[in-house]
């Protein structure tokens, strides 16, 4: 064999060994990378597992066709939209999940994840919050909703610690409706008036005779003469067709209203990711505005129907309003005394509400 031929063979053999070594190194590092990805896969579950859809239910006693139910359905869809489908809330209207008087307890026990109802359905359970239902001279549901949420932020009543309060809203102011004109206290004496909760105290203080019954029974009671009037907002004039069975309304300056809550089961709330909690709270702030304005729209529509049916709206004179306010003042004083006996800041709560209305109500 020629010398140069031997050298070529040795060089080729050496090159082959080097290539083999390179392949081994590449295979080694590929194996290392594969093991690393495998370990990362164990440490971090797949994205789809992390993004499992959170399903919640919402109990609401309003009928499905009621516009309150419609707006709450929009709330559900807005939450789903802003969370990119990570949260889906199904609404159960008409009290099908929990009756209105049991909604709060139903939420605390997990029967419902979220619930909407009135505080007045469970008188005595929310003593410090009941200040919102007192005859403070409300002029709109919107101002009531704004006050209710500011009040909650300031006082954080312990009676609501069992749940996550999403937001509060209120009905429009409650007026007096009767089958005959009521222009003064004398006209009201002895009249049987459908009323419940705070409204019963109002009717009694003004000299009427309160008769407890749900609003759904008011039409028959009025048409049959069981009662001669009701106390409530204008909205039922349309919603419950009460404009057909009353002839006059009396608008007085110390009107009260009913506050209602939208709350969530505390454990369900705490289990939500922080970013989802933030999104829901942002939507809630917007819905305070929407719900407050909606209640007033419904009240306006109810009054229009009332007038169209021949109803007459009586606005009390300044002097007569003062007489009514004087009759209703003991309700406020009794509330403060009752709260004091329970060790609650009723006086401070009442002052806050009164000052808020003086400052922001036009």
Residue ranges with predicted function:
Residues 146-158:
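Signature of the catalytic double-stranded beta-helix
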